[in-house]
Amino acid sequence: MWKITAVYLHFIKKKSMKLNVFLYLNKEEKWKQTTGQDEDENMKIIETYGNYIEKWSNENPGRARWLLKTGWKAQNLKFRFAPDKRLMPAEQYLARLMMDTMIRPLERPEESAIVSIFTPCEILQEAGLHPYNVEGFSCYLSASKAERAFLQQAENTGISETLCSYHKTFIGAAQKKVLPKPKCIVYTNLTCDANLLTFKKLAKMYDVPIFAIDVPMQQNEDNVQYVADQLRKLKDFIEECTGKKITDETLTERLRRSKRTLEKFAQYEKESADRYIPADLVTPLYAGMTNNLLLGTEEEETYVDRLLNDVKKAPAKKGKKIYWMHTIPFWSDAVKNELCFQEKAQIVGCELSRVCEPDFDPEKPYEAMARRMVYHALNGSAIRRIEAGICHAKETGADGVVWFGHWGCKHTLGAAQLAKRKFEEQGIPLLILDGDGCDRSHGGEGQTSTRLGAFLEMLNTETDENTDRQEESHDE
C-alpha cells in the first residue's frame, strides 16, 4: 500500500527564500487529483520556478541552468511514475521521450548539435549527436514560465520584436549563457526566414562550426540532387566535428526506419478517424517535434507502433475533431477550456507531424533525405501546404480546421485567407486564429475565447441542422 510521497527540491538563495517543487504520488501511481484551489497552487509553484530561473539567469547563469535541468528532470519523474492516465499509453511514452530529448543537451551539450526543426537528423544520429532544437527548447522555457526575460534580452540587443518568438526566446537564453555550448550547428532555410538570422548569430556567439542546407523552393529532380550533394558534404562535416565515421550501410538502415515510421504514423491517423482519442494541447506538438527531430530512431518507431496498438482499443468518435495548422498555443487557458481533454471537441492532428510523404527510396539515403526537404509540404508555394493540410484533415476525419497565425510567421500569416477559401471549397470549415505559440504577452485571450468558442458552436449547429434535414427527408 503506497503512502502519499512528496519529493522536495529545495533551491535556496537566502535563508528566508526557498522554492519547493512538490511531486505528489499516490498508491495508484497517479497525480493527486486537484481541486481548483490546488490547481491555482500548482500554477503558483510553476510561476515561482520560472521567476527563479529568470532571476538567476542575471546573477548566476550556471545556477539557472541547473535549476532548469533539475525541474525538467523532476517533471520527467512524474511522466515516468505518475503519467496522465487520460492519455493513451503511447502518448504517455511520448511525453517521456520528448522530455528526454530536452534534457540531454543540458546534460551532455558536447554530444549535441543545435538544429532547426526540419533539419534531417539521421546523419547526426549516426555520429551520436543529439538534436538541440531551437523551437523545442523555447516551448519548454515557455512552459516553465521563464520565457519573458529571454525575449526581453533578445529585443534589448537589437532583435526585432516581429521576429518569431521561438527564435527570440532561444537567442535570449543563449545570450544570458543559460543554454550550454553545442558541438556544432546544422540548419536549413526551409520554410522559416528567421533561421537565416538565428543560427548564424548562435554560431558566432558560441564559436562553433556551422553547416547550412540550402533548399530551393521549386520541386524537381535537379533540386533533389542539389540538396543530396549538400547532405553528402554534411556527412563529411559531422565526421570532422565528431571524429566518428558514418557508413552508407547504417545510414540506409536508419532511412528504412524513417520510412516505416512515417508510413505507420499515416496509418494511425487514418485509423483514428472514427475513434475518440482524448487529447491535451502538448501531445500534438510532441508528435510534430519527434516526427522530425527523432525520425530514424528506434524510440520514434516504438512510439508509432504503440499508437497503432492503442488506436484499436479506442472508443467510438465523440464530439468534433479539429485539425490544427501550425503551432499550438499550449499555454492558453482559452484554448484549454475548449480543446484540452474535452469530449465535445479534440485536436486530432497537427500539421507539423506530417510535413513529408514516405515516398522516398531509403536505399539512396542522401537522395531520400533531400526529397523529403525539397517536397516538404511547407516548401514552395503556399498552395502545396494547403493541399497537404486538406488531405491530412480529411484522413483524420476532421470536422473543422484551425489555421493558427503565429506571431512573426510570414508564411502562415500571408497564406491565411487563401487557406480559408481552399479548405471551405472542400467542405471543411476553417477558423483563422491569430496569436503566439510561445510568448504570452501576445495572447489576446478574450478574443481567442470568443472566436474559438463561436467556431465550435457553429460546427455543432451545422451538425444539428444536417441531422434535422436528414430526419425530414426520411419522414417524406
Positions of the model-derived regions?
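Redox- and metal-dependent alpha/beta enzyme cores, enriched for Fe-S-associated oxidoreductases
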Residues: 117-118, 123-153, 323-394
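Glycine-rich, highly charged phosphate/nucleotide-binding loops
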Residues: 158-175, 378-390
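A charged, amphipathic alpha-helical module
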Residues: 39, 44-111, 228, 232, ...
